[in-house]
Amino acid sequence: MAVGISPGELRELTDDELTERLRESKEELFNLRFQMATGQLTNNRRLRTVRQEIARVYTVLRERELGLASGPDGKES
């Protein structure tokens, strides 16, 4: 999982790729929260980074849904 992916890079991905990235990020967030609860988490900042990445993916998907942005290659997804 890339750290700190930009919204521009996310906009270049297809809907399927965004959905897969969202699933991976949510799984990572779950694992980080589990590590935090058991006291094994060493990088607390990673929680915030993953949450922000999830929000960015949701934002790009919503922009496409509303027609504010198109998918990769200028096509509506």
Curated annotation (Swiss-Prot):
Q: Which domain of life is it from?
A: Bacteria
Biological process terms from the Gene Ontology for this record are: translation
Q: Which GO CC terms are listed, alphabetically?
A: cytosolic large ribosomal subunit
Pfam families per the record?
Answer: Ribosomal_L29
Keyword terms, alphabetized: Ribonucleoprotein, Ribosomal protein
Keyword Transferase applies: no
Molecular function as annotated in GO:
structural constituent of ribosome
Cross-referenced PANTHER family, in alphabetical order? 60S RIBOSOMAL PROTEIN L35/50S RIBOSOMAL PROTEIN L29, LARGE RIBOSOMAL SUBUNIT PROTEIN UL29C
Sequence similarity: Belongs to the universal ribosomal protein uL29 family.
Query: NCBIfam families, alphabetically?
Result: L29
Per its record, how is this protein called by name? Large ribosomal subunit protein uL29
Protein's organism: Mycolicibacterium paratuberculosis (strain ATCC BAA-968 / K-10) (Mycobacterium paratuberculosis)
- What is the name of the gene encoding this protein? rpmC
